[in-house]
């Protein structure tokens, strides 16, 4: 790759965000191109986020070219030890399934999986109605759905208010959500970005939702973003779920308590939720603490309004849902990278799953989803119980997907 002068703006973009890629034109000269999707940015350091943004994308650089470009962008002196370390990092990313292959889109979730997700992992309509009632969502309510996947929840909320934004890291999911919204005649603002970086004006949203994704995210960064973006009196919902199938279930070896993907947390679901509630509550308490002077724009709303504007845990609600865990659910749950991480190949794996499900009765395929809704509110007083295990659960319906 020939030396190239990078503009200050392009250099800062590449340093600040992994959502830009250094691509190669037909004559071999590099240029800053459109957004790419570095799925691994959840856990990568800034150094490797830059590297990943250089290395991925449909017209991304080769490994050696990415290393050369990295040294130019960081103004670092090329060193053999560092070059080897960077190449090793790329090899590790590929073997871990983070990078599918050089010059390919790095998304784990393609259009097929997005459709399976919408059809076989729909967000429960009963829970959507609960959120609408709890937050008083109406036509004028501004809603942000964080890490919202292909829009399972956001699309339902868009039927209540036209002011719904979906923020999602997977490009495949963003495209699927936009297509579904267009097909349904719905207004949906889809943003291709990580929920770890809420780059919005103060108090922009009345309601923020985060469903089944907090475990993927940096919760400190998420809470910092919420203290900035949540409007006065606004609601932040963290929705957690846990699936439970009998050991005799045909797919217990994949989604059971002890499976090829690893063992599940043995604690009761209520205690897992209680631990999460406590952690998030302490984070909000620290981030909204008054009388601590910092040059942090995230503090502006809380500091100006005082204690009444703090984000506090207002309520917790539990729900139960009986539903089938079948071939469709498995396809919506497992990517090819998940499968290969177990040492199996997707083709034989899916053939076995299909055979097991075909031989089972509908009753044998059933299991239970436990749901919890943690409701945080800006302003007011804390209202969650001391012991979550004493909370009852409300039964909600499973609505079979239509073909």
Model-derived regions, located:
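Class I SAM-dependent methyltransferase SAM/SAH-binding core
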Residues: 150-197
């Amino acid at each position: 790759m020939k030396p190239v002068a990078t503009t200050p703006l392009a250099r800062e973009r590449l340093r600040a965000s992994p959502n830009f890629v250094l691509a190669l034109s037909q004559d071999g000269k590099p240029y800053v191109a459109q957004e790419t999707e570095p799925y691994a940015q959840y856990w990568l350091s800034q150094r490797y986020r830059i590297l990943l943004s250089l290395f991925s994308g449909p017209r991304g650089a080769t490994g050696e070219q990415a290393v050369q470009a990295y040294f130019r962008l960081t103004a670092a002196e090329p060193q053999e030890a560092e070059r080897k370390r960077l190449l090793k990092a790329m090899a590790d990313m590929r073997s871990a399934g983070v990078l599918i292959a050089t010059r390919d889109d790095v998304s784990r979730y393609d259009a097929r999986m997005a459709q399976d997700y919408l059809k076989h992992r729909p967000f429960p309509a009963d829970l959507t109605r609960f959120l609408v009632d709890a937050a008083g969502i109406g036509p004028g309510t501004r809603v942000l759905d964080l890490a919202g996947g292909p829009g399972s929840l956001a699309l339902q909320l868009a039927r209540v208010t036209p002011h719904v934004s979906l923020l999602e890291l997977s490009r495949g999911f963003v495209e699927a959500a936009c297509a579904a919204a267009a097909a349904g005649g719905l207004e949906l603002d889809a943003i291709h970005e990580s929920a770890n970086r809420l780059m919005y004006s103060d108090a922009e949203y009345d309601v923020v939702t985060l469903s089944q994704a907090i475990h993927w995210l940096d919760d400190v960064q998420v809470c910092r973003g919420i203290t900035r973006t949540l409007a006065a009196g606004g609601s932040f919902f963290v929705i957690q779920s846990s699936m439970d199938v009998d050991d005799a279930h045909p797919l217990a070896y994949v989604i059971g308590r002890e499976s090829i993907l690893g063992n599940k947390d043995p604690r009761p679901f209520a205690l897992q939720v209680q631990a999460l509630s406590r952690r998030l509550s302490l984070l909000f308490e620290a981030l909204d603490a008054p009388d601590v002077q910092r040059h942090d724009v995230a503090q502006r709303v809380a500091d100006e309004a005082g204690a009444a504007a703090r984000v506090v845990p207002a309520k917790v609600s539990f729900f139960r849902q009986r539903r089938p865990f079948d071939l469709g659910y498995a396809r919506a749950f497992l990517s090819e990278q998940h499968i290969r991480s177990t040492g199996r190949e997707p083709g034989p794996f899916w053939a076995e799953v299909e055979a097991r499900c075909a031989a089972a009765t509908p009753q044998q395929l059933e299991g239970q989803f436990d749901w919890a809704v943690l409701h945080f509110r800006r302003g007011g007083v804390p209202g969650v119980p001391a012991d979550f295990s004493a909370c009852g659960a409300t039964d909600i319906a499973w609505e079979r997907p239509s073909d």
